[in-house]
Design a protein with these regions (language model features):
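Short glycine-rich His-centered loop
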Residues: 2-25
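Caspase-like (clan CD) cysteine peptidase catalytic core
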Residues: 8, 58-84, 88-150, 225-226
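Active-site-proximal C-terminal subdomain of hydrolase catalytic domains
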Residues: 15, 33, 52, 128-226
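Terminal peptide-recognition signature
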Residues: 15, 36, 81
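Second-shell loop/turn segments in exported
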Residues: 22-27, 50-54, 108
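Short catalytic helix/loop segments, enriched in acidic residues and glycine
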Residues: 26-41
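Short beta-strand elements in bilobed, periplasmic/extracellular small-molecule ligand-binding domains
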Residues: 42-52
């Protein structure tokens, strides 16, 4: 698979099933992350850094975005960030305030969460030419409010000319499994809202991850719908 002249293709894959402190476990986040990591490494020549369960505690995530990524990413790199786990959103002055829930988060204590604003700011400071974030968690769409810049929603159909511009020029893209305005969920009763399906190898995945994996294996739409 062509790498489009990138010096480095780096993927950070985060998946959390087993939460601490009474937060309900998830059933497929780790399996989803492992499957995504395998495809990115073998089919797309990515160097993959995986943080699963205990490796995805708050201090580990902060170390990742503040120190590890800046030391690994160059101007001609492409970076992909995949997160599967719990997410929440709260009302903020400028729109929903989104948070990713680390493995060791304390329910009700936002200081123990990873805010989407801090994540966005750390990622935006990286010099990589291409960046893609994929969030499979509740309220993932709140990430768009983390930026003070105008955010453009990509059309359902991307024609070849526009795709080539994305590929050749600096680009920042975000894909989410959920919108920002889902009904608020009590953080004290976080549940597995991601759902699950079973693939042809009897592996359980969230519906979003199953569709993503199918696309990464070459079954994504490649022409406008009829």
């Amino acid at each position: 698979m062509a790498t489009f002249d990138f010096e480095k293709s780096l993927a950070v894959v985060i998946g959390i099933d087993q939460y601490c402190n009474g937060i309900a476990p998830l059933q497929t986040a780790v399996a989803d992350s492992q499957a995504v990591a395998s495809l990115l490494a073998h089919n797309y020549e990515y160097q993959v850094l995986s943080l699963l369960d205990e490796a995805a505690q708050l201090t580990g995530l902060q170390e990742l975005i503040q120190h590890t990524l800046p030391s690994l990413v160059s101007a001609n790199s492409r970076l992909l960030l995949y997160f599967a786990g719990h997410g929440i959103a709260q009302h903020g002055d400028n729109g929903p305030a989104g948070y990713l829930i680390p493995q060791d988060a304390m329910p009700g204590n936002v200081d123990s969460y990873l805010s989407m604003v801090s994540l966005h700011d750390a990622l935006a400071a990286l010099p990589c030419r291409h960046f893609l974030a994929i969030f499979d968690c509740c309220f993932a769409g709140a990430f768009r409010w983390s930026s003070t810049r105008k955010v453009t929603v990509v059309d359902d159909v991307i024609y070849r000319e526009r795709y080539d511009r994305f590929r050749q020029n600096p680009a920042w893209q975000v894909i989410t499994s959920s919108s920002y305005d889902q009904p608020a969920m009590d953080v004290l009763s976080l549940r597995d809202e991601r759902g699950e399906v079973v693939d042809s190898q009897s592996q359980r995945h969230s519906p979003f991850a199953a569709a993503l994996l199918q696309a990464l294996q070459g079954d994504a739409d490649s022409s406008p719908p009829a």
